[in-house]
């Protein structure tokens, strides 16, 4: 029986006598070279008393900063540590939560998955039932100075917690108020003041508002909205499906070939409608952390050719598949072998994307960095700007002319020449060439099997939405009824008002404080190509400047280009 009399099967561990240094979070010890080194796990604090959007944002950023070293970053998304070879003194972080009632509990998070493994309240510590002996041994290093240690008979997965709570996540409210109540419930469980269903419900709240918010910028954004408006509400389908898909998304991204998935992953929008994700591009601003799934293959190409330096303690190398995709570019048109004729030297062109299985728009991304259609290679005619791109036999073409790298920002580059794939016109039938890279819309591409632009709202400073207003753009109160707040994200890197897809979000100059406008997409210029970054900014690739709410003052009704500083007026989030 647990103190207080709640009926629950628990196992009580004998507690060894430890030297106590007065810390409420406990000390962990690791044995190296026959020496014992005490080390306190890092502690991050958060209080619901007077919580603000900024205090919560700072808290989640601090949690992320402690969960990952930043040594392993793939497609701009940090990867959590591999549990194999991870020293025990680096295995956990502690999150100390307090509330208006001045009650305090300390959660323990596993750095390998950002998940809660247990918590401390006063002189008692409680742990979810571990999945294996290794985890069972690891948690013995947590809260070593408590008088009482208990392990629940249940694990911490959502299915079991929902069963115990008697409710599903989609019916459990989240927000600052629910978190306040959850802290009290966890605290009073040690005295018998909390029943098991309430305890399970409280775990669900804490896990979503801390672990899931650390994993996803999207979920962090949802929690910020609740705090901003002092709102209590249950998560919508977009949140639930992200939570359920984190492991599969991590696997798909790490096993992707230059960002393209071997098979799609289905997610849901806020209204419950389903959509499939075929590539990493839309996920870069959505996912903050990935669980480690596999080591990068030796030949894999990373964002802008920067390879992460991480130790490989085992042989679990990523699959490195060879997906078959369409390559979507300027104005949503596809890379196409002209007239479906595969004789050597036939031109590659822009053409409306097909929905059938015609080979001349299907491209295999090969491990050798060739891009092939019907077994033949996408090949540049030479290494000078302006030469055309053709289909050619892979075995007889010049090897360097058939090699391409696909960057996360949508650039397809020939390494030999440092020239990039380009469409100098946005019309159907335009012959593709290679050109000097200026990060223009005419040089933006996306290997995917979803040929339609991704439609989204874009939320920025103070939870306000980016809105097109004739030729101007600024932020206003968000409303699902406002069509002018809907944006189509094109594969070529342009951001277009859903109401008029012939227009583009545009900077007509590359200098700081240039006012961003809505202008014709016709130029397909460098000032019309953008990238959603993992840090929440929207980057103009050519200038290196980001979208910024001028002076953090929405009343000025100006969005400008500005150097990166990372303040809230430069942070944006696509919501679906």
Curated annotation (Swiss-Prot):
1-alpha repeats: 331-373
InterPro entries xref list: Ribosome-inact_prot_sf, Ribosome_inactivat_1/2, Ribosome_inactivat_prot, Ribosome_inactivat_prot_CS, Ribosome_inactivat_prot_sub1, Ribosome_inactivat_prot_sub2, Ricin_B-like_lectins, Ricin_B_lectin
SMART domains attached to this UniProt entry: RICIN
Residues the record lists as binding AMP: 115-116, 156-158
Complex formation: Disulfide-linked dimer of A and B chains.
Mutagenesis / variant outcome for changing residue 109 to A/M: No effect on the toxic activity or the vascular leak syndrome
2-alpha repeat ranges per the UniProt record: 462-497
The 2-beta repeat ranges on this chain: 501-540
Record's protein name: Ricin
Keyword match Disulfide bond: yes
UniProt xrefs under CDD domains: beta-trefoil_Ricin-like_rpt1, beta-trefoil_Ricin_like_rpt2
Each 1-beta repeat, start to end: 374-414
Consequence when changing residue 83 to A: No effect on the toxic activity but suppresses the vascular leak syndrome
Disulfide bond entries: 294-318, 334-353, 377-394, 465-478, 504-521
Start-end of each 1-gamma repeat: 417-449
2-gamma repeat positions: 543-570
Propeptide: 303-314
Residue positions with a glycan: 45, 271
Listed EC numbers: 3.2.2.22
Residue ranges annotated for the Ricin B-type lectin domain, each copy included: 321-448, 451-575
UniProtKB keywords: Disulfide bond, Glycoprotein, Hydrolase, Lectin, Nucleotide-binding, Plant defense, Protein synthesis inhibitor, Repeat, Signal, Toxin
Gene Ontology molecular function, alphabetical: AMP binding; carbohydrate binding; rRNA N-glycosylase activity; toxin activity
